[in-house]
Amino acid sequence: MYAIIETGGKQIKVEAGQAIYIEKLDVEAGETVTFDKVLFVGGENVKVGSPVVEGATVTAKVEKQGRAKKIIVFKYKAKKNNRKKQGHRQPYTKLVVEAINA
């Protein structure tokens, strides 16, 4: 069984036992998170939401908070001696999906 949830402005396909990386949530490691915005539940009994499946939830345990690898943003204008170098590390939350309740 799998489900498609919406979190952080993105839609993510999840299965029980799967580890996922999502946009940072304001929770501590070890806590349990419940997602109510379940858009689709697949498997033997397929349920499609409009826009969400009523009564369906996905529970996951927070494994850790972290920051992704650094990316470098470099802007310049030719012939103007105008240069800007900037780095960015996106914060994330790593979850392990425990159950899909549909």
From Swiss-Prot:
Gene Ontology terms, MF aspect: rRNA binding; structural constituent of ribosome
Gene Ontology CC terms, in alphabetical order: cytoplasm; ribonucleoprotein complex; ribosome
Keywords: Ribonucleoprotein, Ribosomal protein, RNA-binding, rRNA-binding
InterPro entries tied to this protein: bL21-like (IPR028909), bL21-like_sf (IPR036164), Ribosomal_bL21 (IPR001787), Ribosomal_bL21_CS (IPR018258)
One Gene Ontology term from the biological process aspect of the record: translation
SUPFAM superfamilies xrefs: L21p-like
A matching Pfam family: Ribosomal_L21p
Family: Belongs to the bacterial ribosomal protein bL21 family.
Oligomer and partners: Part of the 50S ribosomal subunit. Contacts protein L20.
Entries under NCBIfam families matching the protein: L21
Annotated function: This protein binds to 23S rRNA in the presence of protein L20.
Protein name stated in the entry: Large ribosomal subunit protein bL21
Species this protein is from: Bacillus cereus (strain ATCC 14579 / DSM 31 / CCUG 7414 / JCM 2152 / NBRC 15305 / NCIMB 9373 / NCTC 2599 / NRRL B-3711)
